[in-house]
Amino acid sequence: MKLMILDGNSVINRAFYGVRPLTTRDGLYTNAIYGFLNILEKERSEEKPDALCVAFDLHAPTFRHLRYDGYKATRHPMPEELAMQMPVMKQVLAAMNIPVYACEGWEADDVLGTVGRLCEEAGWDCAILTGDRDSLQLVDEHVSVRLVHTQGGQTRTERYTPDVFRAEYGLEPKRLIDLKALMGDSSDNIPGVAGVGPKTANDLLKRFGTLDGVYANLSRENMKGKLFDKLENGRESAYLSYELATIRCDAPIDFTPENNLIRPPKRRALYDLFTTLEFQRLIDRYGLRSAALEQDESEEPAQPVTGSCTLLDVQTPEQAQPLLSGVTLSIAAADDLSMLVAAPHMDGPDQTAYVLRRETLGTDFVPLLQRLFAADVPKTVHDSKPLLRALLALGVEPAGIVFDTAVAAYLLDATRGAYALPQLAQDYLHIPPADEASLPQESVLAIRTACIDGLTEELGKRLREQGMQPLFENIELPLCPVLAQMEHDGILVDAQALHDFGEMLSERIDACESLIFGYAGETFNLNSTRQLGVFLFETLGLPPVKKTKSGYSTNAEVLEKLRDRHPAVQAIMDYRMLTKLKSTYADGLQKVIGPDGRIRTTFQNTVTATGRLSSTDPNLQNIPVRTELGSEIRRMFVPRPGWVLVDADYSQIELRVLAHIADDTRMQEAFRSGEDFHAVTASQVFGVPLESVTPLMRRHAKAVNFGIVYGISEFSLAQDIGVSRAEAKAYIDSYLEKYSGVRAYMHDIKETAREKGYVETIFGRRRAIPEIKSSNFNVRSGAERIALNTPVQGSAADIIKLAMVRVFHALEGLQARLLLQVHDELIVECPQEEAQQVMQIVTNEMEHAAALRVPLVAEAKQGESWYAAK
């Protein structure tokens, strides 16, 4: 039998800093709770415990604080955004029937140790889940520790057993106490022995076994140099630190493993909490949809939509004629389009839903769909793009979509993350979801048409109230069929060239490995950070730049600083670049080439908070461009024989948008002049004539130009362009002095965000930024950068979307096809004889997509590959 216990404070703290800030519509922060539950469920699935509980700290001082006034004295107070989540977290655990333990005067660590001991005495195994390495001292044959790490929004765990601990530290787990006694622990303000670091402490314990062993052998003969004096002077501090670092296993708690057996949650209580916290995904994950109906007898139960309308199974096209009368239809379809249900909008209760089955209608099915999806038949759907793409695959050319509930919901809350129809119906219409698994498919689709009908009215009203109806009708909705057609068409890839490129990369990778192993004198795992760190900093003796808790850091920043110190470092950087190119592009793209030689990506139009499109399965928006070798990937994307690719992109669109939004006359004049804007900026910032601007000045000005859009700090700018912070500050100050409109915009937009809680693009797209009122400086600063950037980046995204719609329709009548959108760039495939006309059409439509105070400029080229056209 196995029990898993969570170090509640440690795990929720990791979750808080590992998950981006999330808030409910009422302003309650929820990211720590959400992250905690995700970590909990992931680890439950890994460990598969029979029993489960959580230990928390209390606010009262512990015996360690009484023993040493400085214990944890350097810790910052808990951020208010996390503190407000703690009581709610405990409510959630109570609703999940997960016991919570805390003991006044004792820390959660001591509860963990005590639970581990009691489990072992009862013949149980115990798994401790924590983000604190202190607990590693508890590891033995029956107690394991799963150490939680969060970085860059990602969470991972390491499982420590005695063997794993010995392999990492070269010591027994219990000796972690002795290690901390010698080296101290800054996070808990445990002093240790002054001047003794981790390496020295570890070496001492490997020689003498324990802290007692170290002091039993304390002599100038055994401890060279100043080490003897450090240990002699630090003896009292070492033993105090030993006491503070020791986790007690005798906390007075009422505990038996059997009292913590996993039980089903209190479904209704958990459902209510998750609804309040707006955890729709977790409601689905825990299967709580039906819990909405589990109410007290005294309450009037909420009624789900049940699909109780009349279902008419269409046998012939004639029976579907009422659908073609011009009334707006709500349509839901099976993923494979084997069945489709269409219901005319009706205010009364006696609604008829028409069921169209492919197997029933046979050869009449596709022609009926073609008529149903004609432009003169208005339709509302949920998430139209996959439906449109499926119709295109059947040979149907769809039109007439007048409302898309998923896209509307995305505009109303772009940070929501998920736009499943049942969730939207519950949130906006207060309709509990039906148990779809127990219903026939036609009833499920009928229910969905009813939800679409209701949401069309509700979401449409909210779009009008928030001034986003024009954005919806002129940009987002017309874009859906454009994206569907682009996904349907795909782009041709030279599979043989891609294979040959991969073979060439393999040869270069082998050469890098041989070079590195030659310097090492042995082979090792180049993908292991630990082994690579040993090679760089021990075998080669290079100076460590940065250390992490798990050892030496070997990230790109570290390698860049070491590049000139040994040729092996450049070889490692080359190895990483080459393996990335091979695995992600050379190999990855080959796997997704279709039978017709084309790759078809999926454009995500309801994902990003700024309104930009993203590309997945595969991502064709991140094809490398910064290195010549990476750019070679673009050579593999080619037109069909006798055709060319036309590539058109905007010139400095975000800076032009900034000039418009900030209404900065000097910046606008620079763009209207047609001069090189970065050179003009350099002239302004450095106070030299335009003809005297050097390439270095231009490069620095370019970094400031683009950095300002993202709220760059003097520290970041200094790092980017290799100057001192003082110089970087002078550049920024000079820039904002010359472009005073930009400076005013940077101030005003942050104040607007604080006042309204959101910012807008030129076209009215909103992004909520509740974090801008955070008491946490880092969180608030990040929110301010979002406030600065979103109107600029979001407006640029709106413009490129408008351009896509314009280009798509302007190309009608030609054979040319719009294939890809990559940020500010459009790629079109066309016959060679259409190329000049297409280039003119595309640039014209892009340049006239929006009327700004400065001209939009687009440039187009053609070529026999994406590389050649760029």
Regions found by a protein language model. Name each.
Residues A127-L129, L136-K174, M339, A343-P344, ...:
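Charged catalytic and DNA/RNA-contacting regions of genome-maintenance
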